[in-house]
UniProtKB/Swiss-Prot annotation:
EC code: 3.1.1.1
PANTHER family: DIENELACTONE HYDROLASE DOMAIN-CONTAINING PROTEIN-RELATED, ESTERASE FRSA
GO molecular function, one term: carboxylesterase activity
Gene label: frsA
Name the record gives this protein: Esterase FrsA
Function: Catalyzes the hydrolysis of esters.
């Protein structure tokens, strides 16, 4: 089936699909405070979703393209779930968030099909994959249209990988007690086996969102990157997130000695946001299999256990947490009780001495990850490094921070 036909089959013009903002039915905790964060973007009045311009631009999307799509959403006069929120248009039609971003992705998909230069075609496919992922954002469970956009993103990503430098292999990993999961192993030029970074992504992202990290930081140093989706989304959608948050990644780690392209004696874990919860758990539970762990903006304790911190977090992010935990109808109080169990300090891990070297990068006044969480990580490690990343200029400092983290990983891994 061609890409165009697949798009037409998946996105039939129906209007009974549930609208994203209605999927998690929590009791709202009142007026929202403005929130801005380097990794998560910022709350903007009249939008349900956080607008994550930095990460979208970092992944290769032109700022003007973001504004163009937003403008189409704003200008729509179609029926909305909440008339005060632009991105709540009901049904797959003009003005709907998923429709507009997927439509933009299809433009790049068509460019990719028409382009004769393999490298340029690969770039266009990657661009389309990124736009489809934004269409599916924030990847809530039960969002049928978002899941269709994710399927198109994965297909476009596979097309891109065939044309871009290096090699990518799609790999299946067996997990006892449930469905197997699929990951992508990205390998630089040269002969393996390669030192490898196991990516532990955020809860509002897909594994295909991290190609820029591999291409700009790991590949030039001869380091491979292995990604899997977090529990409950993408290729890991049949697995619910539990207090054993590192379960899937642990089984992947255990399988690496049987992967000929990976040097299983030189493996690092890198965690973004809640992915740091996974990475730090691995540092404690799988220290013989891991050389180092790096974290960025970690969610390991405060946000999970501090009611005041949770009150400052946008509704969308709390919806993401509730969705991942399978608590679509829970009260905020029930959600708070459950989240507390995910704190690595409450679990009795953080605070104990850990033999694995751990780095943690943070931004001051980050509403999702205070400095204390990063200090807790690095002070628990026998070889810890704390990295403060200045907020402004945000893009330049984000890049500089990633370069420093990669330097640190390379020094201990290679």
């Amino acid at each position: 089936m061609t890409q165009a036909n697949l798009s037409e089959t998946l996105f039939k013009p129906r209007f009974k699909h549930p609208e994203t903002s209605t999927l998690v039915r929590r009791f709202s905790h009142g007026a929202q405070l403005p929130v801005q964060s380097a990794l998560d973007g910022k709350t903007i009045p009249h939008w349900y979703r956080m607008i994550n311009r930095l990460m979208w631009i970092w992944r290769g999307i032109d700022p003007r393209e973001i504004l163009d799509v937003q403008a189409r959403i704003v200008m729509s006069d179609a029926e909305r779930t909440d008339d005060d929120l632009y991105d709540t248009v009901i049904g797959y039609r003009g003005g709907n968030w998923i429709y507009e971003w997927a439509t933009q992705a299809m433009v790049w998909q068509q460019k990719a099909c028409a382009e004769e230069d393999p490298q340029l075609s690969g770039r266009h496919w990657l661009h389309a994959a990124t736009l489809y992922n934004i269409a599916a954002y924030p990847h809530l469970k039960g969002d049928d249209l978002a899941e269709q956009a994710q399927a198109l993103s994965n297909r476009a990503y596979e097309e891109a990988a065939q044309r871009l430098p290096g090699t990518m292999r799609q790999m299946e990993f067996t997990v006892p007690g449930g469905a197997p999961i699929t990951g992508f192993l990205h390998m630089p030029k040269g002969d393996g086996p390669f030192p490898t970074v196991l990516m532990c992504g955020g809860l509002d992202a897909m594994q295909t969102d991290y190609y820029s990290l591999y291409e700009r930081y790991f590949a030039p140093r001869g380091i491979a990157m292995l990604t899997i989706d977090m529990p409950s989304v993408g290729f890991s959608s049949k697995w619910k997130l539990t207090q054993d948050s590192s379960l899937l990644h642990q089984h992947v780690l255990k399988a690496l000695p049987n992967v000929p392209w990976v040097d299983h004696t030189r493996v690092a874990a890198f965690g973004f946001r809640f992915g740091a919860n996974v990475a730090v758990r691995l540092a404690y539970l799988e220290s013989p299999r891991l050389k180092v762990v790096a974290c960025l903006g970690p969610v390991v304790h405060t946000l999970l256990s501090d009611f005041k911190c949770q009150q400052q977090v946008p509704e969308m992010y709390l919806d993401v947490l509730a969705s991942r935990l399978g608590m679509h109808d829970a009260s905020d109080e029930a959600l708070r009780v459950e989240l507390n169990r995910y704190s690595l300090k409450v679990q009795g891990l953080l605070g104990r001495r850990c033999p694995t070297p751990m780095l943690s990068g943070y931004w001051k006044n980050d509403p999702f990850s205070p400095e204390e969480d990063s200090r807790l990580i690095t002070s628990s490690s026998a070889d810890g490094k704390l990295l403060e990343i200045p907020f402004n200029p945000v893009y330049r400092n984000f890049d500089k921070g990633l370069q420093e983290i990669t330097d640190w990983i390379e020094k201990r891994l290679c």
